[in-house]
Amino acid sequence: MKIKEKATPRKNENVKITTEFIRLDAFLKFKGIAETGGQAKTFIQDGIVKVNGEVCTARGKKIHAGDTVSIFSVDYKIITDEN
């Protein structure tokens, strides 16, 4: 018997930043994904956060315009006024 796994549809959301970059842990708090810095750290260290399609375990990773942060079936595209 074969079991078919349904793929969870991914959501896409643009997130506008007004600075040159935002740290990954600060981004998770900014979007309300993590309630505290400790929770953001846990999400990142547990490997459930991807940056541009690759697992990122560096909580101080600088996220720039054009980057995509993925967590919990949502892809957040970082944008600025310039793009």
Predicted ranges, named:
Residues 47-54:
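Short, structured beta-strand/loop micro-motifs enriched in basic residues and often containing a Trp
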Residues 36-38:
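Beta-rich strand-turn-strand
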